[in-house]
């Protein structure tokens, strides 16, 4: 059993009111993505539970590879689904966890219109479907990017709001995530929808997609190919980070214990480090070095100007959540080992 699999099982053993999910249908969009896929794995690790998990994604082949161990489990169902289109059919979904969103920066430059449409219209379509099909709670997976640029070095709380330059294509992601959050709260106010929101910090872990060009994915690929770690900035940006199993577990705490209409930051307060620190740690673990390269113009377009993005998690921790055992260096090592296992 891999270390990652142990993390999944340990997350599934958390002291949560799992009985709330009994005999319920749970829809997870973005199920082949980094966070959504991990969430599906944690839910399916409860073999004795009677709920059904509906994993929605665009790529059935990728889903089969990811969820092969569950594919013939009667409680697991794959739905071919593109978030930009309305959900078809008449299936009842008591819980909808909306984790589908293209968070890869390269697409912020290539397809900003599609990013906005999928984040806003996709959220509205899912809530409307749920309202007519037995929805009990809607969990929206937003992003820490909604905070924008803060002032000074203060950790963001859920009531903070920083500056986002809306007159740039790069704003397509944080601005549409903000709009989708407001949409959730508006549905709660006008139609009584029970909606909760999570704002994950920078999340890392195994099973990211091949098209994901976020910085940690690039670094991991360098390691897997036996290359030096390539950086295209000075890497001084400070970030809150969270291991994917910790993030998915936090989402379940919010789903089952969170207060209606509220938003919750997700971050590991013991994992605050710069992008350069991550690069140097991975290089050290792999016996390589960090090298610097000049970014291409297309890459510069999607660089964020946010130098400090650290999140306070008091509100989340008040629900009972805490990260799994192990420091971030160990969890990076788990990520590499799982990716190597997958490659073999």
Task: Give the positions of each predicted feature.
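Conserved Rossmann-fold NAD(P)-dependent oxidoreductase catalytic core, especially the SDR/UDP-sugar
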Residues: 98, 124-171
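Glycine/proline-rich active-site loop of Rossmann-fold NAD(P)-dependent oxidoreductases
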Residues: 178, 194, 203-218, 227, ...
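Amphipathic terminal alpha-helices
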Residues: 1-20, 50-51, 326-344
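Conserved C-terminal active-site "lid" loop/helix of NAD(P)H-dependent oxidoreductases
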Residues: 244, 277, 299-323
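Mid/C-terminal beta-alpha module of Rossmann-like enzyme folds, strongest
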Residues: 257-301
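N-terminal Rossmann NAD(P)H-binding glycine-rich loop of SDR-like oxidoreductase domains
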Residues: 25-45
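NAD(P)H-binding glycine-rich loop region in Rossmannoid oxidoreductase-like domains
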Residues: 80-118
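Active-site Tyr-X1-5-Lys
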Residues: 168-196, 224-225
């Amino acid at each position: 059993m891999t270390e990652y699999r142990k993390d999944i099982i340990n997350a599934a053993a958390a002291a949560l009111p799992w009985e709330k999910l009994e005999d319920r249908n749970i829809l997870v969009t973005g199920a082949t993505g980094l966070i959504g896929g991990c969430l599906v794995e944690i839910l399916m690790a409860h073999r004795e539970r009677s709920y059904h998990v509906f994993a929605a994604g665009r790529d059935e082949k990728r889903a089969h590879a990811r969820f092969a161990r569950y594919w013939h489990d009667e409680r697991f169902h794959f739905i071919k689904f593109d978030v930009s289109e309305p959900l078809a059919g008449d299936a009842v979904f008591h819980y909808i966890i909306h984790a589908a969103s293209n968070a890869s920066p390269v697409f912020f430059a290539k397809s900003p219109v599609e990013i906005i449409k999928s984040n806003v219209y996709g959220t509205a379509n899912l809530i409307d479907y749920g309202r007519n099909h037995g929805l009990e709670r809607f969990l929206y997976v937003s992003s820490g990017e909604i905070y924008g640029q803060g002032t000074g070095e203060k950790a963001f709380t859920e009531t903070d709001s920083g500056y986002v330059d809306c007159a740039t294509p790069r704003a397509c992601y944080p601005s549409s995530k903000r709009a989708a959050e407001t949409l959730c709260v508006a549905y709660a106010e006008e139609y009584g929808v029970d909606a909760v929101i999570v704002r994950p910090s920078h999340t890392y872990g195994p099973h990211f997609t091949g098209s994901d060009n976020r910085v940690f994915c690039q670094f991991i690929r360098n390691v897997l190919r036996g290359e030096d770690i390539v950086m295209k900035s000075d890497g001084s940006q400070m970030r809150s980070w969270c291991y994917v199993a910790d993030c998915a577990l936090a989402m379940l705490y919010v789903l089952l214990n969170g207060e209606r209409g509220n938003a919750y930051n997700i971050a590991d307060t013991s994992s605050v480090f710069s992008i350069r620190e991550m690069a140097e740690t991975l290089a050290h673990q792999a016996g390589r070095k960090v090298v610097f390269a000049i970014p291409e113009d297309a890459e510069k377009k999607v660089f964020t100007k946010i130098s400090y993005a650290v999140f306070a998690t008091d509100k989340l921790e008040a629900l009972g959540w805490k990260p799994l055992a192990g420091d971030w260096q160990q969890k990076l090592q788990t990520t590499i080992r799982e990716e190597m296992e997958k490659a073999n």
